[in-house]
Amino acid sequence: MVIVESPGKIKKIEEYLGQDYTVKASIGHIRDLQDNKLSIDVENGFRPEYVVPADKKKIVYDLKKSADKAQTVWLASDADREGEAISWHLMETLGLDPAKTRRIVFHEITKTAIQEAVNNPRQIDMNLVDAQQARRVLDRLVGFELSPVLWKKIQPKLSAGRVQSVALRLVVDKEKEILDFIPTPYYMIEGLFITQKTSSPLKAVLEKRFASEDEARAFLTDCIGASFVVSGIERKESVRVPAAPFTTSTLQQDAARKLHFSVSTTMRVAQSLYERGLITYMRTDSTNLSSLALGTAKKFITENYGAEYSRTRQYKTSGKGAQEAHEAIRPTFIDNTAISGTAMEQKLYNLIWKRTVASQMADASVMNTTVKIDCDKRPERFSAQAVTILFDGFLKIYMESSDDAAIQENETVLPEISVGEKLSANAVNALCKYTQPPFRYSEASLVKKLEELEIGRPSTYSPTITTLTSRRGYLVKGDKEGKKFQVTNLSLKGSNISSSVKTETVGAEKGKLLPMDIGIIVSDYLKANFPGIMDYDFTANVEKDLDKIANGELAWNNVISSFYYPFHKKVEESITDGQYNRVSREIGVAPDGELIVAKFGRFGAYVQKGDPEKKQFATLAKGQLIESLTLEEALKLFDLPRNLGQIDGADVIVTKGKFGPYLRFGDKNIALPRGVDPMKISLDECRGIISQAQEKTAVNPLIAEFKDGEIQVLNGRFGPYIKSGGNNYKIPRGVDAVSLTQEKCQEIIDSAGNEKKRPARFRKANK
């Protein structure tokens, strides 16, 4: 009997091993720490208290039943620390006899690899198990002790983690860096010249930038009637070297850049390719290729491209904490240039195939040419550059970087030209640009940064980002429009200087990780109160200690002990100190003299106008942050309510509350669909929204259901309400029942639960 992690591997492995073997799947871990308690005996060496979750009990029962009948049990979980721990948990939980139990590992699902693994079994490596156990215990201690601090000081249901909180800090710090950035205008000068000998066009850029329109205009004025001459030509040959085969992080980065895959999509598709036996194991720090893969690649390249394109290379893994002796991610068979499968599988496989083959190809040789152009009336020089490919080498099949892409896309043949040749200026343009702020992190660039800082490991990158974006709502993946500036461009043609007004956009980005207000608040609090946890070096040093545990150099519980006691003391101090002041920022004073304040409450960020006696509220618009909100933007949020007219004799009013924009139609409140601008919506659009809401509530007494019926949103005689645990909860005014999520329902229930139970039929939720 062979036990693997994923059922997707069963068919292939059974096919390779034959009738004497039965393959079963554990479907990941079969036991873990309990969800609702610390589950760690701190007083006795941090001993974990493992349990079999309810959804794994049948799997454990079936595995034990099969194992008892088997002559030999082969534990074939994945070849990493998590996989080693899974094998150990199987051994312990199933009560396997060590005499008839073998541990086998393979890095690809091929007949050769499987048979070699069976022929070379080993014992479970307890150093690897201890390293995984140390990480699990450490992460549980951090999360279990820090999260309640956030619940008390900021808001319920928040979480913190050893890796996730540091990743959050990276994104938040980058956002603050961008907010502090002040765009500065400058002028770049572009010359469009004509050669004397061949009358060919030649574009060149002035090597100096000008700070103002006046300086740029003065330069163009001096160019009137000026002579331009080629003062120098420099040619320099250089080589481009192919990138190493993929590791987990470089695959995630390249798939994001070239295929626009999210990190989680890349890992899901790679898992499928691995289970189908098409690629090697997809969680690896290694850039090594096996001798068999090197030989196969050399043969393929020589036969298909020629011997001059082949160059065998063995790359050294750069990461200091690279884990077990995996290979890089590569096709199991280089000859398989294409595969069947989904479009995503085909695209990712093609990317992996090209990267692997390119890594074993010759360098590309290019010629870089720079032409210098002098003006007799000014000391500044123009410069024109061109790139010519002399030998394409690995570029024949694969481009890794933007530099490589630029070589092929911008390969330029300069006109025949010589030093001393005079040029005529067809036009000289002064283009106003702005300095650009730092780029925000994309999923892929965040993974790259985490890897550079040695934070996390291949198996943690994807779940960390998923936790921050999907489960916690600290980050959102989205676009930024950027700031728009009106600029004046100048153009010299002949002796005439003309001007034109254009719009220059600064800081526009697509598909980047954007911090939400709650993410900024949590990051700032943790950085101020738990600087050790949020320190990049601390998190990286933990990874190094885990590597030492895996190598048998450190005892795992000693590592935990040295961290835990100082950390626990700080947690206790934070719990007992004064109430954390929830975020509140004065924005300014409205024209009517009322103070405008931005705050963060139970239902998110909002602005408040006026004193407690007659205050007004408005939620922040999508993309707005408390930290960067201006007075002008805040005042626009109070332009609501808008009366759009009547439908069926009832007023239709667009307004906004703590819970977002909604329609007030008669005595009904209907939430606006996500993405609808309350300042631009028309009466006709409202008609459709109202009609849909009426149809849904009229035909469906059950509006929504969550957690297998534990939470229900229902229509009653007095309107929609929430039912949970035998109790009914009123839905706060301004909240549309149709748009409620499980999280929002839970917040309403929690809010009502904090009040003293009333004798009435309903518990009233806090407004």
PLM-predicted stretches and their roles:
Residues 1-136, 142-145, 306, 402:
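Intrinsically disordered, low-complexity regulatory segments
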Residues 12, 147, 180, 263-264, ...:
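Basic, low-complexity terminal or inter-domain segments flanking catalytic cores
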Residues 12-16, 88-89, 168-178, 354:
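Short active-site loop/helix that positions an aromatic residue
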Residues 70-74, 152-154, 231-238, 249-257, ...:
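Glycine- and acidic
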Residues 78, 254, 258-265:
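A conserved hydrophobic secondary-structure block that centers on an alpha-helix together
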Residues 109-191, 235-239:
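C-terminal or mid-to-C-terminal helical accessory/interaction module adjacent to the motor/catalytic core
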Residues 210-245, 252, 418-422, 431, ...:
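Metal- or metallocofactor-binding catalytic centers and their adjacent structured scaffolds
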